[in-house]
Amino acid sequence: MHQTNFGFNKVDYTKKQWLVNNIFSRVADKYDLMNDLMSIGLHRLWKNEFIMQIPNLNSNILDVASGSGDIALQLAKKAKARGNNISLILSDINEEMLNNAKKKSIDLNLFQNMKFIVANAEELPFLDNSFDYYTIAFGIRNVPDINKALKEAYRVLKPMGKFICLEFSKVKEGILKDFYKFYSFTIIPSIGQIIARNKEAYEYLVESIALFPSQDDFRIMIKASGFEEVHYKNLSGGIVAIHSAYKI
């Protein structure tokens, strides 16, 4: 039977999605707080940089692995301020996370141009050539078959549509690399235990980050899925990177 990584452990391919889904269900109520604490607020700056990759907000946008909706909500807020006609579909395999996003959109009065769909990134329930942009932030490393998800991204994008991915990456510099490793494997799981009462979930988080392909290797994977003009931009010394590509 086909196996894949769940953190540093090997599990059956069919079991990984259930395990990942279970983790996010258990930490859903503390998800936003944990993001702020773990990244010392940096995730907000990274996401601001990420949405700048979308200059045209008069667009159909698919946000995959939406989680609690940070990316889509920022885009909706920006479009509303500009008077743009944006259409957003928030998709996530975890219904509890998506419900959190829906509640936030209602509280912020940003729900008007949004749809919320529980879906698997490997088998998206959308027609070919449907979207101007495909966004995914801190989600693709949790997909059991990343190559399959990339091919689905290519399929649902319109010709000249843009793929944009924000993901943890590989730190290059020596001192920062050593500190980041210590912080990831020691501090983050401890914060997870104190705040979310779930050390194991955040051990999985840091292990999944450690196993995710390097910037250049992920670039090769994106290109192999059919995309052109594949580029990446490191943020915070390579702690995260923004990957972008076009369907041509």
UniProtKB/Swiss-Prot annotation:
The gene is ubiE. Methyltransferase required for the conversion of demethylmenaquinol (DMKH2) to menaquinol (MKH2) and the conversion of 2-polyprenyl-6-methoxy-1,4-benzoquinol (DDMQH2) to 2-polyprenyl-3-methyl-6-methoxy-1,4-benzoquinol (DMQH2). This is Ubiquinone/menaquinone biosynthesis C-methyltransferase UbiE. InterPro entries: SAM-dependent_MTases_sf, UbiE/COQ5_MeTrFase, UbiE/COQ5_MeTrFase_CS. Its EC number is 2.1.1.163, 2.1.1.201. It catalyses: a 2-demethylmenaquinol + S-adenosyl-L-methionine = a menaquinol + S-adenosyl-L-homocysteine + H(+); a 2-methoxy-6-(all-trans-polyprenyl)benzene-1,4-diol + S-adenosyl-L-methionine = a 5-methoxy-2-methyl-3-(all-trans-polyprenyl)benzene-1,4-diol + S-adenosyl-L-homocysteine + H(+). Keywords: Menaquinone biosynthesis, Methyltransferase, S-adenosyl-L-methionine, Transferase, Ubiquinone biosynthesis. S-adenosyl-L-methionine binds at residues 68, 92, 120-121. SUPFAM superfamilies: S-adenosyl-L-methionine-dependent methyltransferases. Belongs to the class I-like SAM-binding methyltransferase superfamily. MenG/UbiE family. GO terms for biological process: aerobic respiration; menaquinone biosynthetic process; methylation. It comes from Rickettsia typhi (strain ATCC VR-144 / Wilmington).
